[in-house]
Amino acid sequence: MKDKKLLFDRKSHVLYSKPCKKEILAKIALHYPETERETVWEKVQRQYVVFLSDWRTDLGGKKNFHNGVGGTYDCIAIMSYYVVCKAVTSFREIEEMEENLILPTFRKLKFVDCNKPFWRKLMYKAFVRAKSGCDKWHDYEMSVAPYETDKPIYYEFTACPAAEFAIKHGLTDIMPALCNVDFASMELLHARLIRTNTCVNGCRCDYTICGDHDPYVKEHPEYRDEAGFRRNK
C-alpha cells in the first residue's frame, strides 16, 4: 500500500521515516518469500494506523525533533513490525534496526571525545538545548543537572512517549531493544553511559555520561538485566 493512502491524522501524527521503512522492508525480505512480502508490509502499515488511531495527539507532529529518524514514531513503526512479525523476528534484530537508524549520525561525530573538557562542555550544551525542545512539547520531560567540570554529565527523563506507548500496548518486552542504542551512541563519542533505570521499569530514565577513560566507568560496571536492558551497578 502506498504510504499516502494510509488513513491517520496527519496534522497530529507523522509517517514513519524513509530510513525506518527501508529497515522494515529489509527485515521482511529476510524472513518471507517474495510472494508474501507485500502482504506482510501492508499488515505492518495497517498495524501502524491502528496504533495511531488512539494515540496521543499532542506530540508536535513534524515540528517536534523527537519525531524524526529513530524517534518516537519510528519506534511505533518498529513495534508494528514486531507485532506482525513476532514469529520470525528476534530481540537482537529489533535492537539492530534501531541502531541502524540512530548510529549513522553519531558515526559522523567520531571526532568528538568526551574525555576532553571542550567536547564534554559542548555535549552538555547540546543536552541543555534538547531540554528546551522537550519543555516546548512536554513529551520527554527532561531535567539537566548543573555542569560540574570534574564530574560526569547528568540528565534524566521522567516521561517518555515511547515507553508510555509500549506500556499501553503490552510491548514492554521489546523496549530494551529500543533503549539500548543509547549506550552504543555514547560509545561512538568516546563516552560511556551509566544507567540504572528507565521509564519502562522505573520512574525515570537516567543518563550519567562521562569519558570512556573516566574511573567512574570502572566503578559502575555494565550488565544486562533479565529483561535485556543494558544497565550499570
Regions found by a protein language model. Name each.
Residues M1-C85:
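N-terminal, charged low-complexity regulatory/assembly segments
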Residues I28, C85, K131, D182-S185, ...:
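Hydrophobic, Leu/Ile/Phe/Ala-enriched alpha-helical segments that form helix-helix packing faces
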Residues H66-N67, A166-H169, R224:
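A short, structure-level motif marking secondary-structure boundaries and short turns
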Residues Y73-K168:
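Amphipathic interaction/junction segments at domain boundaries or subunit interfaces
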Residues E141-N201:
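Short, hydrophobic/π-rich interface segment
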Residues A162-E164, D212-E219:
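Short, charged/polar, Gly/Pro-enriched secondary-structure boundary elements
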Residues T196, G202-D212:
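C-terminal edge-of-domain segments
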Residues E222-K233:
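Short, cationic low-complexity segments
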